[in-house]
Curated annotation (Swiss-Prot):
Compartment list: Secreted
Family: Belongs to the polysaccharide monooxygenase AA9 family.
GO molecular function ontology, one term from the record: monooxygenase activity
Protein's recorded name: AA9 family lytic polysaccharide monooxygenase A
Catalytic activity: [(1->4)-beta-D-glucosyl]n+m + reduced acceptor + O2 = 4-dehydro-beta-D-glucosyl-[(1->4)-beta-D-glucosyl]n-1 + [(1->4)-beta-D-glucosyl]m + acceptor + H2O
Organism: Schizophyllum commune (strain H4-8 / FGSC 9210) (Split gill fungus)
Glycosylation: residue positions: 193
Keywords annotated in UniProt: Carbohydrate metabolism, Cellulose degradation, Copper, Disulfide bond, Glycoprotein, Metal-binding, Monooxygenase, Oxidoreductase, Polysaccharide degradation, Secreted, Signal
Amino acid sequence: MVRLASLAVLGSVIATASAHTRVWGVYVNGEYQGDGIGQYVRSPPTNNPVKDLTSAAMKCNVNDAREFEVPKRVSVAGGDELSFEWYHDYRNDDIIASSHHGPIQVYMSGDDGATWTKIASDGYDTGSSTWAVDRLISAGGKHSVIIPDVPAGDYLLRAEIVALHEADVAYDQNPIRGAQNYPSCTQITVTSNGSDALPADGVKFPGAYTDSTPGIIFNIWPPNAQDPATYQVPGPAVWDKAPGGSV
């Protein structure tokens, strides 16, 4: 009986460990922009998370050798709604394991990706008692952000999931565990010419998150679960010129 129980737990762990995710493509004002993998999404080679907070992959979930411009860009204007569509292995599949509770955030940068400004953030909703990832799954893998009224030009959008199912301990203390970060960068061109330039004091990836950053270490499981209502999303506050987003 003990052996069977152990096998069941092991099977659950294996299934959970493989239930990773990345961005497939985006919509602009509800219109699908075509498959983005390696086209306008700087797609990572796998759907694996980034756990080392000092890794260059914290920027776009690609290593230095793959961090280059892909051939296309998505045209948007200030005030447009851009929706990201995540997937696991195939479009419209299970998106991500239901155990991977955590926040979803979006950052914006100039095309060089040197510094990043947070333009949307969603963590734990006390009204519905759900995490942003829970609602992402219910929404078929889609969440949205409103493009700020920035000057015309080329930009990067960095959508991010931080899965907390193993975040009870820091990765550098136990590399088997630690928060699982899923960043994904989409290339856009803003065609309108707004007046709200991105602030010069954005954060850097890697560097924005450390083990001491609130929201990186957080225990969501009993018997020592922390109250999710106290959860603080990692990183800076959302830019006050950003209209925000939704899941």
